[in-house]
Amino acid sequence: ACSMRNGWPPTMSDSFSELLASRTVSVVGLGVSGRAVAKVAARRGAKVIAFDAKAGAGEALSKELDNVSVFTDADPEALADKIRTHARDLLVISPGIAPTSALYQAASVAPVEMISEVELAWRLHAVGPNAASPWLTITGTDGKTTTVNMLASILQAQGLNAPAVGNVGKPIIQVVDEGGYDALAVELSSFQLHLTKSVEPLASICLNLAADHLNW
């Protein structure tokens, strides 16, 4: 379900600085991409509510940023209850959390829009100062990292600021927030694509498909 509370979801008329301001962003999973989402959202004026199974997860974040609250619980069902109770506006879930898990199921029934870090990064990119800088995306079962690094090297050899991001390098949302890029070479796993809805790359490649990661 998608909540319209507090002006969410945004329209394309929202500016780069206004997209997250005064809204609540819920983050499930404080891994590398989850921490990046929390930092970017909080620094852009959002209230951040984060959830993680590990005790102490996000402690540094909540100390660094006043508008970040963190709920932790090693019991998946108890943490799922916290998500259902406290999640608001927009929810960004870790790509490592499977759709069959209690946490994903709790997030999916909360009165929020659930998206990936990649999707949020695209929405920021689309209204930001680098909106004209293309994304070149690569997915597939095998060879993604090698190919995306080759792509970034080709672009950089032409003098472009074109980092490899996504499932390799820095989280995409961090790079979009920092800005200054001419193009992005983006590695996307199937997990990252699962809740990615509106990304429009200039070009994309699916390298291959094979039976892998079937326990997700």
Regions found by a protein language model. Give the residues of each.
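Phosphate-binding loop of NTP-binding sites
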Residues: 42, 80-84, 95, 99-216
